[in-house]
Amino acid sequence: MSTIFRGRLRWFPSQSDFSHAPDGRINRMNIADLRQEYMRAGLTEAQADADPIRQFERWFDDVLRARLPLPNAMSLATVSAEGAPSARIVLLKGVERGSFLFYTNYLSRKGRELERRAAACLLFLWSELERQVRIDGTVEKVTTGESDAYYATRPLGARLSAWASAQSDIVGDRKVLENAMEEARRRYGDHPPRPPHWGGYRVMPQEIEFWQGRSDRLHDRLLYRRKGSAWTIERLSP
């Protein structure tokens, strides 16, 4: 267990968390018994920055200092035209001009859903720091120049796979993907251009909630709401 947990978080279940078959194999885990106590820190209105973007940057700096794995991983939730939600993990690639950037295939399920309804919810979970950040906002594509510039920084394999993968489509087997990758490599070599169906989005927040775990489940929840060019801050009951 990492020292950052200081013995308070039960990430590894004990024997009592499992039932066993006669031969000693683990049969199932009693998920309801997995609990943890939140003890690390608090978040008061006096501590919070008036600007939620600056508050996010503060917390993100804490994450980087803690050397957490995949610090920029976030859940991205979208909704279909029929109102069916879907979610997946993507990577934050920048915070600029008050918006949050990520890149993907525009023809993927998330791309198609964002085309129909340009709204999304982002969620960061930093368990080791007992923190979450939820961001609700509208979405727009970044410029082609911005997408070109970021695409050029990606490793060669990642650039080629953007051509090889028709993201979210059904394929017969992995060999189909490997053949498509070889075809992209043969066609473009070491200098693949950016596919027109691949690029970035920016999420422009309308609400940002900061959640800090506290003892006895009396968690701190501060909600920022955009009001014109300013932000209001409200405390939510846990």
At which residue positions do the language-model features occur?
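Serine/threonine-rich, low-complexity intrinsically disordered segments
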Residues: 5-6, 28
